[in-house]
Amino acid sequence: MKKVIVYIDGSNFYFSVKSRFNVKLDIEKFCAKLTKDKNLACIKYYIAPIDQFSNPNMYAKQQSFFDNLREIKNLQIIFGRLEKRKKDGEEYYVEKATDVNLALDLVLDAQSNSYDEAYLISNDGDFSGAVKASVERFNKKIVYVAIGNKKSISYHLKNVSSKTLNIDEKFISDLKIE
């Protein structure tokens, strides 16, 4: 049975699902449905935590979300960070290290033979180099899980992945959280 790891770009996943379907999904059931008859070894969820002092309400909601994630068997949360920036007097945050962590794990896990097949849940074309290396150098099957409309789906990921799986309303119909 093929050993599978699911890699989730958390922020990208959240905003893609929200903009496309305007729902919250049960991540455990979503990953199980994606990988159905395969050996799901691990789910890796990459995210940058919100600073508790900059936005206490969002921080509390995110911590509750993390607590729910920690209940999922074989799920690892890999944290990046948020860096505060200022432009034209306005403060905003930029997510750092999450994409690099995911790309590194995808390639290093391929090299160490931790998976036969990986599912990448992100529309970020910056992952195309890591996907290409995993497919070509380590002979791994990488499934690009595309969530969104045709504009948001990454042409670069589609080109280098072994397979593209477009998520539609029908796929998620039984995975919604109220």
What positions do the PLM features span?
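Nuclease catalytic cores that cleave nucleic-acid phosphodiester bonds
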Residues: 71, 76-178
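Domain-level signal for Mg2+-assisted phosphodiester chemistry and nucleotide/NA-binding surfaces
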Residues: 1-94, 137, 141, 148
